[in-house]
Amino acid sequence: MENFTALFGAQTDPPPPPSALGFGPGKPPPPPPPPPGGGPGAAPPSTATSAPAGADKSTAGSGPFYLMRELPGSTELTGSTNLITHYNLEQAYNKFCGKKVKEKLSNFLPDLPGMIDLPGSHDNSSLRSLIEKPPILGGSFNPITGTMLSGFRLHTGPLPEQCRLMHIQPPKKKNKHKHKQSRTQDPVPPETPSDSDHKKKKKKKEEDPERKRKKKEKKKKKNRHSPDHPGMGSSQASSSSSLR
């Protein structure tokens, strides 16, 4: 026995179950694998593929194409159906879209050449007329010669006078912010210097007598309270004698 343990080592103890460590309830050990030759109690291997969790049970045994669904059924609404007639909106369409517009089409598209307001059948400018009656052309196309190409070449030279100032932009005018009162009220005409001087002189003449009277009253009050006034000394002397 000592020789056996020396060759193969001491027998190790099995690890403790997870319930003993506190991680969860203990699970039973897995069953031993079947013998390679198969025994009398061994079951034959299953040939059908097992469906993953969450798949329909009806499609579980249909083979590897269990994710395919049935094709959608035919619907009445397609791209070729008229939705106005399908939803019975003919009256509303005629009510809102059947009115004639007062303004012409050329008012909305002023840059297009030709008579836009008239239909193309009047002047044979419609696409259908070009398809039905194509224009008569020559059988072959001739290349452009060198003399004809000279008309498309650009030659250096001075600009004409009417085109010289086209790239120069005029300076923008600076609009000063005016008061709101000046916008609402009528503009007052400017007074001439003669009128303003005449008004100033009139005001001075009217205010002169009042100013003179006020100035005289102020002077009288100052003289009464000043020590140099003669009446002040006599009044003080009389008051002192009465006290004695």
Curated annotation (Swiss-Prot):
The keyword Transcription applies. The modification Phosphoserine is found at S194, S226. Residues 26-38 have a biased composition (Pro residues). GO terms for molecular function: transcription coregulator activity. Its main location: nucleus. Residues 171-182, 212-224 have a biased composition (Basic residues). It is found in: Nucleus. It comes from the Eukaryota. GO terms for biological process: positive regulation of transcription elongation by RNA polymerase II; positive regulation of transcription initiation by RNA polymerase II; RNA polymerase II preinitiation complex assembly. InterPro entries: Mediator_Med19_met. Residues 1-67, 171-244 are annotated as: Disordered. Belongs to the Mediator complex subunit 19 family. Component of the Mediator complex, which is composed of MED1, MED4, MED6, MED7, MED8, MED9, MED10, MED11, MED12, MED13, MED13L, MED14, MED15, MED16, MED17, MED18, MED19, MED20, MED21, MED22, MED23, MED24, MED25, MED26, MED27, MED29, MED30, MED31, CCNC, CDK8 and CDC2L6/CDK11. The MED12, MED13, CCNC and CDK8 subunits form a distinct module termed the CDK8 module. Mediator containing the CDK8 module is less active than Mediator lacking this module in supporting transcriptional activation. This is Mediator of RNA polymerase II transcription subunit 19. The gene is Med19.
